[in-house]
Amino acid sequence: VSTMWKMLLNDDGLINRVIEFFGGEGQKWLSDPDTALLAVCAASVWQGFGFETVIFLAALQGIPRERYEAAAVDGAGPWRTFRAVTLPALRPALLFVYVVGIIGAFQVYDQIYVMTRGGPVDSTMTVVYYLVEKFHRLDLGHASAAAYLLVVFLAIASAIQMRIERRAS
């Protein structure tokens, strides 16, 4: 996936060619510090979109039809049905996708390695990329500290998200 996005976002890639075809000016998506992280994020979101779609589809199919029928009998319109029936039933799936997404976002490595190698000017450097680079350079102290902090941060973020979910339900 990352190789495909690297080719699409290259200076002479398809996206710049389409922009130039319509009279615009191509961007240096992967070599400009202002746009490199955005390009990596777009590739990561696109890569995870199918997984999240399947989770939401399964959650939607798990909502009993009787709830929608009861809402219709009570005179609820589409917006009210969504807020009162669909959204509460999707809450566990939303939490799951959110937690997995946050954890995945902090563990992005392959997209950055393939697309930018942490550059330009370290603009796409993430904790995991930093950790792996330090490990490869045998700077094990910094690598271990980064790994420990990553685990602690992800545990705290997950605990906060779970607590928010418990309060909401």
Label for each model-derived stretch:
Residues 1-169:
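A structural signal for multi-pass alpha-helical bundles of membrane permease subunits
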